[in-house]
A protein has these predicted regions:
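Structural and coupling elements of P-loop NTPases
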Residues: 1-249
């Protein structure tokens, strides 16, 4: 999963991070940390996610990996990272050529080092299979065939095609109900149709027409919504001051 690279009014960054068990910071070996890095990393660190740092484009002639690593460390300190988060693993990579290594003198052949590090460093998802189905709606997804769909991570239980479910808002009020007409599970970047989804899966569901972002899609017996970051209301700020220009008149 990926987050927006900037602050917004919809709290989308926070909701996307709710689906994650770890975080990878991909930074340019020459340019270093960009302005958007600070906002997203602050949210990720605040949620207790442990980062993996990848220094990308290491084959650039103007790369400066040591300085960039120091910049990343200083940024994490400024953002309030704890000791465990500051002890982050580092990989050097070239996304264009498709390789990542722990040390620059290692053979540069594939991304196995990254995949192995994810398995070692990122904790397993904390899921409760035995509880009734509940999923937090994180994003809306439009499909020309399925219509209005909801994207989210299953927080507990399992759900099957044609199962009757309801949607409740953050106050626990029922806002929609219906039947799960389609289930798609993300496998990498692919969307795979499935008959059943379970806790820990990131999925797309179809069948509800009124449910929206931050609602809990759940079994009919569930009464309490999953915790979520609400959508901020539309905001406009205006500053009115005295015209102090020498040309005022």
């Amino acid at each position: 999963i990926d987050t927006p690279g900037h602050s917004d009014f919809s709290s989308e960054v926070e909701r996307v991070l709710d689906m994650a068990d770890g975080v990878i910071l991909l930074t340019d070996a020459a340019e270093g940390c960009l302005p958007g890095t600070s906002f997203v990393m602050k949210k990720a660190l605040a949620q207790g996610l442990r980062p993996i740092v990848i220094i990308n484009k290491i084959d650039r002639k103007d790369s400066r990996p040591k300085e960039v690593i120091d910049e990343v460390f200083d940024l994490f300190v400024a953002l309030g990272a704890n000791d465990e988060q500051l002890d982050f693993p580092i990989l050097y990579a070239s996304g264009r050529d498709g390789w990542a290594v722990k040390e620059l003198d290692q053979p540069k052949e594939n991304l196995h080092s990254l995949l192995n590090l994810i398995l070692e460093h990122v904790p397993k998802p904390k899921v409760e299979i035995d509880k009734p189905f509940a999923m937090l709606s994180t994003l809306l997804y439009a499909d020309s065939f399925l219509g209005r769909c909801l994207v989210g991570r299953v927080g507990q239980g399992t759900a099957r095609i044609n199962q009757n479910v309801k949607a409740i808002n953050l106050e626990g009020q029922k806002v929609d109900s219906g039947r799960l007409t389609k289930l798609l599970r993300f496998e990498g970047t692919k969307k795979v149709p499935v008959e059943e989804v379970m806790a820990g899966d990131i999925v797309i569901i179809a069948g509800l027409t009124k449910a929206t972002v931050a609602d809990t899609i759940c079994d009919l017996t569930v009464e309490k919504p999953l915790p979520s970051t609400p959508i901020d209301p539309p905001t406009m700020s205006i500053t009115i001051s005295v015209n102090s220009s020498p040309l005022a008149g």
